[in-house]
Amino acid sequence: MIQKYTYGTPFETDAIVTSIPTSEGTPAYGTISTENGFSFAYDMDDNDVVYGLGESNRGINKRGYVYESNCSDQPNHTEDKISLYGAHNFIVISGKQTFGLFVDYPGKLKFDIGYTLSSQLKITCEDADLYLYVIEGETPYDIVKQFRKIIGRSYIPPKFAFGFGQSRWGYTTADDFRKAADGYRENNIPIDMVYMDIDYMEDYKDFTVNQENFPDFEAYVNEMKEKGIHLVPIIDAGVKVEAGYDVYEEGVEKNYFCKREDGSDFVSAVWPGWTHFPDVLNADARAWFGQKYERLISKGIDGFWNDMNEPAMFCTPEGVAELKEYIKDNFMDKEEAPGFTLGDKVNALANNPEDYKRFYHNVNGQKIRHDKVHNLFGYNMTRAAGEAFEKIAPGKRFLMFSRSSYVGMHRYGGIWMGDNKSWWSHILLNLKMLPSLNMCGFLYTGADLGGFGADTTRDLVLRWLALGVFTPLMRNHSALGTREQEAYQFENIEDFRHVIGVRYRLVPYLYSEYMKAALNDDMMFRPLAFDYTDDAFATQVEDQLLLGNEIMIAPVYTQNAKGRYVYLPEEMMFVKFLPDGTISQEILEKGHHYVEVALNEVPLFIRKGKAIPVADVAQTVKDINPATIRMIGYEGAEYDRYDDDGVSTL
């Protein structure tokens, strides 16, 4: 059962697609106050578990810390960070009472889950203008499925998007991208996509291509497609301020950019220099910006990734002016050396909270200050693209994922987990985010395999790939100036060929499970406790996940480990894809086990009485031969495999 409570005058986020009448009275759970903003307080028992919050730090059980829904350009995913790129305001409390809460509020929202008081859950925001949805069900899984039905069907990508992709910030010329693609093809390592970071553009201007580096971009796109490679360019949120740049001039002429309070176009520095932000919360501006994707689609592009759309800001003219004044007042013509406060002031120029209060959106003729609806920007930038795709190429699927998001964006694209680091702990963070994101409708997701920032290691890339084998988005991505981490850069390339090859062997199963989850408003990845509700130990397990109804995954995430400990809540079949192409299968009883997993092996566990389809390795998804599909798992088990053309919208 779902009940909706309305407080004040909420902003319509379009997160919910089902019409639900407002309930009278107050919710049956917790205590609500609307004095000095909004607060919800609930007393938890010691054994209560709290799930959700989508893209967020720490564990699957969110107890013991504080989290903030405030889409942030935050590349340092350390445990002290309370906000990441997304705002996913859905939680499920499981314990003495089991219920879910979705707070449909687009501004900054704080979840104190046993941080200030260990027994108290407290949700607060500065404005008492929101919708609160209270969902009751017998189990957390039941509650999630109810929520998923009211937020609409998850985005469905083209089937090629289930292949492996290579990316790196620093690929600039046609030869750079060609070299990456050829490095995989020449070493017989499967690949479907090469991603194009910001350097493919002309001066970082959206919807442009550097003509010097790509003199005939359409021919180049076709050349890559002949190799089985889809090029996937990045699009950023900021539009460069430059006379003669038609996107800029059109936006100014039609008043499609976000405004300062005085009505002038708001200015912020990002990669191109000074930029304007398209007012994607305005329906006309959103349609205008979305239509610009056609410029690259007309050249043969069929996939994009949206970035910097929190929106991120390096600085603003106002912030720079304030810094200059601070330096003048405190350091000019003075003998004392500047203290560390000067460095703090410089660093504070980027993503300054005050700057998010300096610009406005035009929503149905009403001027809305950005910070009040901040978490909707990335969502609506991706919505702009998704709505445009339906008009540009009706009936065709496009690959689309974003960095920033809010519940509702899951209908238009997926997300990647942002600028992680080449740290072993981030394999585990990657794993733990998967079910939380699925709870909020984000099925097409994955992390930068091998880590984006910092220098990676061969063993880290292999172990991370062995998790990435199972995530819908499987992409190796790294930062400018870091160690090159393409699979062919390391010794014993055959190990990478094998591990990535396992992904292609599993595509018949992974695609089927993804589509079932999308079409049935279900989760693809779940915590063990969602299925094994009477198993107290399953609630404690946070480094193993159920995938579909057939398998459990338990990656190795510790350097130098030869294997790992696992907990089996029932008898399962331990399966390893071995580097010689064979598959080992061993029945293990319910309980605790240590399993050996070599660096070049991919493990999974098949649940009792189940089986899954596997195919032979292919170099691209379209080359997977259905005639090679066979079943592995328990003898006599059946599997209902979903398949389609992988191109047409549903």
What are the residue ranges of the model-derived segments?
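Aromatic- and carboxylate-enriched substrate-binding clefts and catalytic-loop regions
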Residues: 190-496, 531-532
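Extracellular structured ligand-interaction cores
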Residues: 37, 85-89, 96-98, 106, ...
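Catalytic and substrate-binding clefts that recognize carbohydrates or anionic sugar/phosphate headgroups
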Residues: 1-158, 168-170, 174, 181-186, ...
